[in-house]
Amino acid sequence: MKLPILLVYLTALIVGLSYGMHNPIVPVFSKEIIGASYFELGIIGLTNFLPYMFIPLFVGILLDKFNNGLLLSAGITLNTASIYLLSISQSVPEIAFFRALTGMAHAFFWPPCERIISQVEDPENRVKSIARFMGFFVGGLMIGPLIGTFLLENLDVTYRILFQYSTYAIAIAIITSLLLSKYGKTTQHSTIAFGSIKQMTKFPVIVIMLIFCSTAFGTFLTIYPAFMNDRSISESNIELLFFIFGISRLATLAFVGPLQRRTFHSLIATILSIAAGMLVVFYSFTFEMFTIAMLIMGFGFTIYFPLTFEIIMRKSQKKFSGGLIGAYEATFGIGWAAGPLFAGIVAEAFGKDTPYLGFFVIGIIVTLILVLNRKKLQIQWNQNL
């Protein structure tokens, strides 16, 4: 394995570990300790992901002009600071602001890693390398909740102390990201303006799919843990459920190769699994039912990323790669920001479980759109790459 790829994987593992330790608890902390309503949880989720709607576009431009490893280091440093500040927050506005910093930091994490992998690996191996990168990140997300559960149950740490431990964990990734600066030098200095951003408009079906998946995932990360807590799932069991979710995601990534060969069917299965998982959530009141939902959604929230990424990369010119990655990630930001706001408003107006039924219905509609546009979802070679 090439050293820069290994360093990217290690960085992803560490960052995922930190995220897994504290992210599932943030909505519970906000609701139980700070006293946030579901609408306020939606606002916190919105501010968390709102920067990801715009900053990846800026980062995409920087990827073609500056050292990708240093950009990654800057993002992880900001992330470290934002998690620590979360541990001393006292109000909903403070949490919202600190989560916005986290969103900004994440915009400097994912795109540089994708770009380094894209530069080092040839197109034939890129899907597997991106999937492995995601696998290490998911592995961290899977192990993190177990560590969080152990700390909460056996060492009797508070939520705030758990956030501080997460800060120490992610700080280690600053070292590995700095080592990547040796390999993160850009090989091109083209002028990236709206040309690369406009490339995303060539993929309307992919954009619709990404927005649905990311909207559901944004709700999953920011509202769903509080919903489980309201249905009598304890904090430690919430962490355990996210561990189970991680197992499902890792198992899915092991089959990226076969799934890639059936792109259309895999993407249809992705949407249907998210929709079905949300329907199970709607009817869930026990740990066992939530476990079933986590296992189903683990597939859907995993496989769409490497497949859609490869579709747009193979159908676009290499000169647009940096800006295109930024535009691709910004599309996630739109969904991540809209999801919590949508779920928060709907939960306050129609009931806490209504958003999940809504996602099921929307998922069926998106599936029909994909079926009607099958040819646009096939991975094909672009000779200009």
Model-predicted segments: where are they?
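Helix-loop boundary and gating motifs at the non-cytosolic
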Residues: 2-49, 203-210, 214-231, 235-238
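Structural signature of the two symmetry-related core transmembrane helices
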Residues: 70-84, 265-280
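Conserved MFS/SLC helix-loop-helix module at the cytosolic interface between two early adjacent transmembrane helices
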Residues: 54-90
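Transmembrane alpha-helices of Major Facilitator/SLC transporters
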Residues: 50-54, 239-259
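Cytoplasmic helix-loop-helix junction between adjacent transmembrane helices
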Residues: 98-137
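Helix-to-loop junctions at the C-terminal end of transmembrane segments
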Residues: 55-67, 252-264, 347
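Symmetry-related core transmembrane helices of the 12-TM Major Facilitator Superfamily/SLC fold
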Residues: 161-178, 356-372
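Juxtamembrane intracellular "pre-TM" segments in multi-pass secondary transporters
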Residues: 1-2, 181-208
